[in-house]
């Protein structure tokens, strides 16, 4: 609204998607049907998810199609918006959950039966029954509303301690309304209490298909140490519920927003006497992380798995008996320590030899920095890995740059003798450092110091991407990518176009 200088979230996802899907199926005559982009519903009614209609190849020409494809999808979305609507590629809407002025169009009061939120109305949740059911079931399984506390950025005018005056401390509509006053809302923090604060965030995800399971496992493992680094390099979400935060990333916000663990599982209530700590087959157990968090184990190198892994022992044993290797069996058994969050009655009794729905029900609600994706039943899709940590950027050029950089890194991993492996515990440390304010300049990250040794050192992000000065054993990610490009046959124009994307990544980490 230019006249009143306000910006709100449009809740017209359903209408816009209907128009887009009709357009993509009937109006794009110049694009083959199997190559037309697709648009999908997401958690928030103010969100659109888009994917290319067809996977890209690995040639230089295919890489240079990434940005035009993103531009096409944005153009299509804009075509079906109203005159006062704009498709914004931002991680989190800065005023989501504020009380002083409406933040959605149309405006709604927060009193929803699914979330019980003090700040967010259920009307911003996708209408499909899956999404409000997810919201309610996380709250019910947990035994309370989710508890999100983001450190507040402090300046000379910030009161000490800061007690948020915008929290409706005296609301008495739902039983959980008193949680904020009873300790759920921390002082000097931005308090949020609903799944929508996390699943209302947007990100940039890239999926790779490998020629075989062994290559997929190698790519998965080599990408794991890079997930915190790319999170820091793409950091783009410093504002929550109208307050400037002391973090720059969404990750811990989403992690807390879907944390369905009970008090006992979170370690906030005692285990029963004699109860094993990591036994998913018992009713009470400890779970170290939310189901939205960083990867917990490698698939190819046990020595880097230095953190105890909670597993569903029956699943692990069944997989081992069926010939699945030990590390992959442990990975899958770890996914199955979680309960399903939504099951539709018509899908309870399925033939698992023909349907993967039961597996995907668990797999798709384990939201980690990487996802290892077995081939679906039927068709020609192979083993895939999904890189999930990056934050969405404002422009198509920026998003294309990080996608292309990641694709080129995947080629480095598969064609050059590199090894980024390091203890998973240090990857977890890096994930927390990556989210701190101005992590590019203020933090140092654990990273392997040489491909000839398993030792790690702490480096700045610039050191890791450009190479450590005076250390020829740690060449840096960007020099490795350029070395790979040097081996390819391409025109000078193509190389210059690729270099523009890599230059953006290089400048971002400086």
Where does each model-flagged region fall?
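Phosphate/nucleotide-binding catalytic core
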Residues: 1-510
């Amino acid at each position: 609204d230019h006249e009143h200088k306000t910006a709100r979230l449009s809740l017209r996802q359903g209408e816009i998607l209907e128009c887009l899907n009709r357009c993509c199926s009937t109006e794009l005559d110049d694009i083959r049907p199997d190559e037309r982009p697709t648009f999908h519903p997401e958690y928030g009614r103010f969100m659109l998810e888009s994917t290319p209609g067809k996977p890209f190849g690995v040639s230089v020409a295919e890489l240079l199609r990434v940005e035009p494809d993103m531009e096409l999808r944005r153009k299509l979305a804009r075509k079906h918006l109203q005159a006062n609507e704009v498709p914004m590629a931002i991680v989190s809407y800065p005023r989501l959950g504020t009380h002083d002025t409406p933040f959605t169009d149309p405006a709604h009061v927060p009193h929803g039966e699914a979330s019980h939120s003090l700040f967010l109305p259920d009307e911003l949740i996708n209408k499909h029954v899956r999404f409000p059911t997810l919201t309610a079931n996380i709250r019910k399984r947990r035994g309370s509303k989710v508890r999100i506390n983001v450190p507040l950025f402090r300046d000379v005018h910030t009161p000490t301690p800061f007690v948020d005056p915008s929290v409706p401390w005296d609301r008495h509509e739902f039983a959980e309304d008193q949680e904020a006053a009873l300790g759920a809302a921390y002082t000097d923090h931005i308090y949020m209490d609903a799944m929508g604060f996390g699943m209302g965030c947007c990100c940039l995800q890239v999926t790779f298909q490998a020629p075989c399971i062994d290559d997929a496992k190698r790519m998965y493992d080599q990408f794991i140490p890079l997930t915190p680094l790319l999170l820091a390099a793409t950091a783009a979400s410093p504002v929550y519920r109208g307050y400037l935060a002391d973090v720059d990333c969404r990750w811990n916000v989403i992690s807390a927003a879907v944390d369905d663990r009970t008090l006992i599982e979170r370690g906030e209530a005692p285990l029963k006497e004699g109860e094993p700590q990591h036994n998913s087959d018992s009713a009470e157990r400890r779970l170290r992380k939310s189901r939205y968090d960083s990867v917990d184990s490698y698939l190819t190198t046990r020595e880097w798995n230095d953190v105890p892994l909670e597993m569903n022992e029956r699943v692990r044993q069944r997989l081992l008996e069926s010939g699945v290797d030990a590390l992959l069996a442990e990975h899958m058994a770890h996914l199955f320590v979680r309960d399903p969050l939504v099951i539709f009655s018509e899908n309870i009794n399925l033939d698992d030899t023909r349907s993967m729905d039961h597996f995907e029900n668990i797999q798709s609600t384990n939201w980690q920095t990487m996802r290892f994706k077995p081939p679906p039943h039927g068709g020609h899709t192979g083993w895939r890995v999904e890189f999930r940590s990056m934050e969405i950027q404002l422009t198509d050029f920026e998003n294309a740059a990080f996608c292309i950089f990641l694709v080129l890194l995947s080629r480095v991993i598969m064609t050059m003798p590199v090894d980024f492996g390091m203890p998973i515990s240090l990857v977890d440390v890096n994930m927390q450092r990556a989210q701190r304010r101005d992590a590019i300049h203020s933090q140092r990250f654990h990273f392997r110091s040489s491909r000839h040794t398993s030792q790690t050192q702490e480096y700045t992000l610039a050191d890791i991407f450009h190479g450590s000065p005076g250390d020829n054993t740690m060449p840096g990610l960007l020099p490795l990518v350029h070395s790979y490009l040097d081996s390819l046959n391409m025109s000078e124009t193509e190389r210059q176009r690729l270099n523009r994307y890599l230059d953006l990544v290089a400048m971002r980490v400086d």
